[in-house]
Regions:
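Short acidic, hydrophobic short linear motifs in intrinsically disordered regions
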Residues: 26-32, 119-133, 142-146, 151-184
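Short amphipathic alpha-helical interaction segments
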Residues: 38-46, 186-203
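A short, conserved structural fragment
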Residues: 50-59, 198-213
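Low-complexity intrinsically disordered segments
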Residues: 208, 217-225
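Short, amphipathic alpha-helical interaction segments positioned at domain boundaries
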Residues: 78-82, 169-186, 203, 222-249
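Eukaryotic partner-binding/assembly regions in large regulatory complexes
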Residues: 1-115
Length: 249
């Protein structure tokens, strides 16, 4: 298909804006937003450039987002980069997967996947979140131990939970972190580890971390992602199975 030069130029302008800002809001860039939403050829060109750059271009509400795919280390974050930002010095894979589990737990506490909006609460206290993490890790580790014991009786050693989550490894990594009730920001403490994750999520525009009140709120950006893209019922039920949450809990 042959595209008009003006459409190509406009699509490049939109894509460059997305590369720089990762989002394009109607109220801030009305002309570019209108071109994307009302001109099919412009939208197709922008999406094509996104595909070449290993990203998806999606619109939720009145905002257009550039979302790097999971394996996009250039526009997104590599495992090594995340480990460096979120975990203590010399962190292992156990520490990295623990950080991802913390984020998953945070999402589940905010979103229940029910109704017209998946959001279930407006905020969570940091202390409550820390208790949730400890509780879910312990429950998961207990289930894994029971499953491994049952499989040992059947001569099937080395089994993990059904979803393949190594809860005992993450539990060990979490227990290796010191507790500090003085508000330490060191990543070698449970409080500092959680603080680093919350600061990272805030920098990505996904949460509002009110440190003086020890409170976490979600942003409209995260709400949109969860409602429109990430948290359909299939994804939600799988996440709840991983965390070991039953229907009547």
């Amino acid at each position: 298909m042959a595209y008009e030069l003006e459409a190509i130029r406009t699509s490049q302008e939109i894509f460059y804006f997305l590369l720089e800002h990762h989002e394009l809001r109607e109220e801030e860039e009305a002309q570019l937003y209108k071109a994307y939403t009302e001109q099919e050829e412009v939208q197709n060109l922008v999406k094509s450039q996104g595909e070449i750059a290993g990203s998806n271009i999606d619109r939720y509400g009145n905002v257009i987002y550039l979302i790097p795919k999971e394996d996009n280390d250039f526009l997104g974050f590599s495992k090594a980069q995340l480990k460096s930002v979120l975990c203590k010095s010399g962190a292992t894979d156990k520490d990295y997967y623990l950080s991802q589990f913390v984020i998953l737990t945070l999402l589940v506490e905010f979103y229940d996947g029910q109704g017209s909006s998946s959001k279930a609460r407006e905020y969570i206290r940091v202390g409550e979140l820390q208790n949730c993490i400890s509780s879910r890790l312990k429950e998961g580790a207990d289930r894994q131990t029971e499953a491994e014991a049952a499989d040992e009786e059947e001569k099937k050693p080395g089994a993990k939970t059904q979803e393949g989550i190594a809860f005992t490894d993450m539990m060990q990594a979490y227990e290796a972190l010191r507790s500090d009730d003085k508000g330490s920001r060191a990543k070698t403490t449970k409080e500092g580890f959680l603080h680093a994750i919350l600061v990272f999520l805030e920098k990505q525009g996904l949460i509002e971390y009110v440190e003086q009140d020890e409170m976490v709120k979600t942003t409209k950006k995260l709400d949109n992602f969860m409602d429109w893209n990430l948290l359909n019922q299939n994804h939600y039920k799988r996440v709840m199975r991983i965390l070991g949450v039953t229907e009547d809990e």
